Amino acid sequence: METKTAKLLDGKAIAAKIQQELSVAITQLQPEIGRPPGLAVLMVGDNPASAAYVRNKEKACAKVGIASFGKHFPAETTFRELEKVIAALNDDERVDGILVQLPLPDHLDAVALLHQIDPDKDADGLHPVNLGRLVRGEIGLRSCTPDGVMRLLQEYEIPLQGKQAVVVGRSILVGKPMALMLLEADATVTIAHSRSHDLKSITQNADILIAAAGRPGLITADMVKPGAVVVDVGMNRVTDASGKSRLIGDVDFESTAGVAGFITPVPGGVGPMTVAILLQNTFTSYSRAAKK
C-alpha cells in the first residue's frame, strides 16, 4: 500500500509574500507620512535564543523598510527603568510598534510590563485591550503567532467553517487567542491542555489540529485523523546524542506526515509567519498615522 505524504504548509514562502506586499505598501505610503515605519524591540539579559530571535526580527524589518530601534538592557535592569523606556517610546512619533522580547529575567513581571505599552503600538498583540478586542470580534492588533496561523490557512484555502478544530495548549500567547480566531472563522473549537483526559481521543476528532503545548513530539501519527490539517506551533530546542542542538516541534513530523493532509514543518512553518505578522502589525499602526 502506498503511503501518502502530507502537503507542506510553507510558512517561509507565505511570509516572504507578505513581506513583499509590505515593502510595496511602505514605499507607497512613506512619502505621505514623511518617515519609515518604526519598530522598537526591547531585550533584557543575554538569553542566546532571544538574541537570535531579535536579530531575525531586525533583519526582517530592514528587508521591508521598517526602521528598527533595538534596545538591549542588562539582566539586572529594574521594572521602573523599563517602564520609563516604554513611556518614552509610547510618546515617540517615530515608533509605531513596541515589542518586549520574552522571556524576561525572573525578577520582572512580563504581564505588568506589557500593560505599559500603548495598545495602538502593541506590535505583539498581547495587551489586554487588544485581547479584549479579539474576544469581542473588534478590529485591533492581533497576537502574531495565532494570526500567522490563520493567514497560513487562508493562503492555502483551507476551509474552517463548521470544521472541528482542536488547539492543544492554553497559553495567552498562542492557545487562547488561537481558539478565539478559529471560533471567529466559524470552526467548532476544543481546547485541550496538560490536564485533559485521553488527549488522543480528542485530537483524533480534529479536522484542524493546532499543537501549541511546548512539548517536543507530543503529537504522534496515531493521534491524528487521516487527512487532517496539522499546524505545529512548537519550537523546542533539543540536544541530540552528538551534542548538537536542533529545533523540533510539538508534532512528530516523520510519522504524522504520512497521515495528515497538510502539515507545517519546524523550522519553516509557523515561525516565519509570526515575524511577518509582527511587521504587518507595525505597518497597521503606521498606516493610522496617514489618517490622522
UniProtKB/Swiss-Prot annotation:
Its EC number is 1.5.1.5, 3.5.4.9. One of its GO terms (cellular component) is cytosol. GO terms for biological process: L-histidine biosynthetic process; methionine biosynthetic process; purine nucleotide biosynthetic process; tetrahydrofolate interconversion. It catalyses: (6R)-5,10-methylene-5,6,7,8-tetrahydrofolate + NADP(+) = (6R)-5,10-methenyltetrahydrofolate + NADPH; (6R)-5,10-methenyltetrahydrofolate + H2O = (6R)-10-formyltetrahydrofolate + H(+). Transmembrane segments: none annotated. The keyword NADP applies. InterPro entries: Aminoacid_DH-like_N_sf (IPR046346), NAD(P)-bd_dom_sf (IPR036291), THF_DH/CycHdrlase (IPR000672), THF_DH/CycHdrlase_cat_dom (IPR020630), THF_DH/CycHdrlase_CS (IPR020867), THF_DH/CycHdrlase_NAD-bd_dom (IPR020631). SUPFAM superfamilies: Aminoacid dehydrogenase-like, N-terminal domain (SSF53223), NAD(P)-binding Rossmann-fold domains (SSF51735). Keywords: Amino-acid biosynthesis, Histidine biosynthesis, Hydrolase, Methionine biosynthesis, Multifunctional enzyme, NADP, One-carbon metabolism, Oxidoreductase, Purine biosynthesis. Pathway: One-carbon metabolism; tetrahydrofolate interconversion. GO terms for molecular function: methenyltetrahydrofolate cyclohydrolase activity; methylenetetrahydrofolate dehydrogenase (NADP+) activity. NADP(+) binds at G169, R170, S171, S194. CDD domains: NAD_bind_m-THF_DH_Cyclohyd. Homodimer. PANTHER family: C-1-TETRAHYDROFOLATE SYNTHASE, CYTOPLASMIC, C-1-TETRAHYDROFOLATE SYNTHASE, CYTOPLASMIC-RELATED. Belongs to the tetrahydrofolate dehydrogenase/cyclohydrolase family. Catalyzes the oxidation of 5,10-methylenetetrahydrofolate to 5,10-methenyltetrahydrofolate and then the hydrolysis of 5,10-methenyltetrahydrofolate to 10-formyltetrahydrofolate. This is Bifunctional protein FolD.
